[in-house]
Amino acid sequence: MDRVVIIGSGAAGLSAAIRLAEENVPSFIVEEMPPWRAQSNMAEGGINAALDTMGQHDEPALHEEETYKAGRFLACREAVHRLTHSAPQIVNTLFAWGMSLNLNEDGTIQQRPFGGQTKKRTAFASASTGKQLMYTLSLIH
């Protein structure tokens, strides 16, 4: 059977392999270094998603507008829309898979402010979000 070749074992590569596996499509990852050495491990800030866990009435449409504006209106509008509207589901899926994230007292995902945003929209794992993301994706893959 043919296999899809994925170049790179960072977050994008592992995510692609997981998505293909969900569709029963075999894949093969070509990597220069193991996943724990990928650049994705270096990410510290967090993952932006309009989860509205901080009581600020956040929503994907506002996230979309702020992302498009932060990109000086040069980004592909459709890509920004897809990214911002799928972000809550992606973060919730990662959390359901066991990704360690900082939590509020009520057990919801804690979010903090980050550049270019008017709402607390960044889900994070202290200063090791990238490491937690890669660990989770490696377990699922």
Each predicted region: which residue ranges?
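N-terminal Rossmann-like FAD-binding beta1-loop-alpha1 element of flavoenzymes
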Residues: 4-28
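A short, basic/flexible loop-to-alpha-helix module at the beginning of a structural domain
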Residues: 1
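Conserved N-terminal/central alpha/beta ligand/cofactor-binding core
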Residues: 32-140
